[in-house]
Amino acid sequence: MRVVVLMGGRSSEREISLKTGKAVAKALRELGHEVYELDLDKELPCKLLEIKPDKVFIALHGRYGEDGTVQGLLEILDIPYTGSDTIASAVSIDKDFTKRIVKSLGINTPDWETFISEGDVLNTEWNKFPAVVKPVREGSSVGLKIVESLEELKEYALDLLKKTERVMVEEFVEGRDMTVGILKGEALPVVEIIPKKGVYDYECKYTKGMSEYRILKDEKLSKKLQEISLKISKFLSLKDFARIDFRVTKEGKIFFLEVNTIPGMTELSLLPMAAKEKGMDFKKLISIIIT
């Protein structure tokens, strides 16, 4: 099969995307595919029309890759691609919209408030601290910060609004971080994330030694997390592969955090770890996604 691996892009997650793309391209070549590695640029449509790929493996993270933009382009060009479609991608990258949907399904999610203007920030009466402040449409915990006071919240949110269109503040729920990989409509084993500091931020995700990971052995909790993940996945019409993040309190209450429609495929990535627990090595995982 002639496969284009699309990586890089212009989002703040460019470097992680390049790592994912290189790993995917290597696996595809070892599987016998004819592989082309392309960055996201203005010449992309022309390059794709020239190569005429059988499929595009989207290894882009964040803006333009996970928000439905490149999916829409590929649909216009009538080129099949991996992952969720334009609408599912656009919905899932929007943390505010996704939380509204998940809440409507009867699933717990931390309380939150979204700011679209300086006035929203200055007039907020948010009073739950500590709290998490982050961009609405970024991944890999880019821009995420824990704040301890209303003054700190306003200062950081105003700063973020200079760089992004919308910002949200979210209740900080004390508990354990869990993530569930979805592969072709099946929930993979649950991975527990143990960050060396209080929150699983960009540094903890992509710096060796900053987090520990283990397969959750609590069968009852695992089953519940998998059931919730499949419910969310089906409602959002996620395709091929995805990852859904949760926080579980010491009382066992489950809170949905966010959806990742193009989870990382680096040496520290969690979806390959979960797949390995099911007996799939990295090449097997990529083979399943591409078919």
From Swiss-Prot:
Gene it is expressed from: ddl
Signal peptide residue numbers: none
Family: Belongs to the D-alanine--D-alanine ligase family.
Xref: NCBIfam families: D_ala_D_alaTIGR, PRK01372.1
Binding positions for ATP per the UniProt entry: 125-179
Protein name: D-alanine--D-alanine ligase
Subcellular localization(s) per the UniProt record: Cytoplasm
Organism (species): Aquifex aeolicus (strain VF5)
InterPro entries, sorted: ATP-grasp, ATP_grasp_subdomain_1, D-Ala_lig_Van_CS, D_ala_D_ala, Dala_Dala_lig_C, Dala_Dala_lig_N, PreATP-grasp_dom_sf
Enzyme class: ligase
